[in-house]
């Protein structure tokens, strides 16, 4: 039996921070590993994670994710005290950390987690974005553009069914 050429599967998304794309304009995105405990991995496999109020900060040359809520399972761990909002260390190279530190300190950028996903089936990765907060008028422009795209698609569909 001949094996078919299998394309690399897209990473399975665990959670997305939808609010981040509305609140921030990202100029650069990068992938970071995350240091987790066993009960956290089990909870993530069950989909009990929330990134909505999450952000990344740098301290002593290391990156930490704050505000990521992982709800512990009742059966996950009986001998460890589970803290759902503990700090999670992000695993980045020294070069990446130095770059982030320079941009955050000098140019006022924010580091925000965008999504969490599985890499190669076993590794949890976090996509972080380096961006600046949007002003209110920027948010309104984005909303208008989104509504225009929906309206345009509706008109095109209507014209297609007529003709």
From Swiss-Prot:
Gene Ontology CC annotation, any one: cytosol
SUPFAM superfamilies linked to this entry: Small protein B (SmpB) (SSF74982)
Keywords: Cytoplasm, RNA-binding
One BP annotation, GO: trans-translation
Main localization category: cytoplasm
The keyword Transcription regulation appears for this protein: no
Keyword RNA-binding: yes
Coiled-coil regions, chain positions: none
GO molecular function: RNA binding
Cellular compartment(s): Cytoplasm
PANTHER family, sorted: SSRA-BINDING PROTEIN, TMRNA-BINDING COMPONENT OF TRANS-TRANSLATION TAGGING COMPLEX
Family label: Belongs to the SmpB family.
Free-text function comment from the UniProt entry: Required for rescue of stalled ribosomes mediated by trans-translation. Binds to transfer-messenger RNA (tmRNA), required for stable association of tmRNA with ribosomes. tmRNA and SmpB together mimic tRNA shape, replacing the anticodon stem-loop with SmpB. tmRNA is encoded by the ssrA gene; the 2 termini fold to resemble tRNA(Ala) and it encodes a 'tag peptide', a short internal open reading frame. During trans-translation Ala-aminoacylated tmRNA acts like a tRNA, entering the A-site of stalled ribosomes, displacing the stalled mRNA.
Protein name per Swiss-Prot or TrEMBL: SsrA-binding protein
Organism: Shewanella sp. (strain ANA-3)
């Amino acid at each position: 039996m001949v094996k078919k050429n299998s394309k690399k599967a897209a990473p399975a998304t665990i959670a997305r921070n939808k609010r981040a794309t509305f609140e921030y304009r990202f100029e650069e995105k990068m992938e970071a590993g995350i240091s987790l405990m066993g009960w956290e991995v089990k909870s993530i496999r069950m989909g009990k994670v929330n990134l909505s109020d999450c952000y990344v900060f740098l301290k002593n040359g290391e990156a930490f994710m704050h505000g990521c809520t992982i709800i512990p399972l009742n059966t996950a761990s009986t001998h460890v005290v589970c803290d759902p909002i503990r700090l999670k260390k992000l695993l980045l190279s020294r070069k990446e950390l130095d770059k982030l530190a320079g941009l955050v300190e000098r140019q006022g950028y924010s580091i925000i987690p965008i999504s969490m996903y599985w890499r190669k089936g076993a590794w949890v990765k976090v996509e972080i974005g380096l961006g600046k907060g949007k002003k209110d008028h920027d948010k309104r422009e984005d909303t208008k553009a989104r509504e225009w795209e929906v309206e345009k698609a509706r008109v095109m569909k209507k014209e297609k069914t007529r003709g």
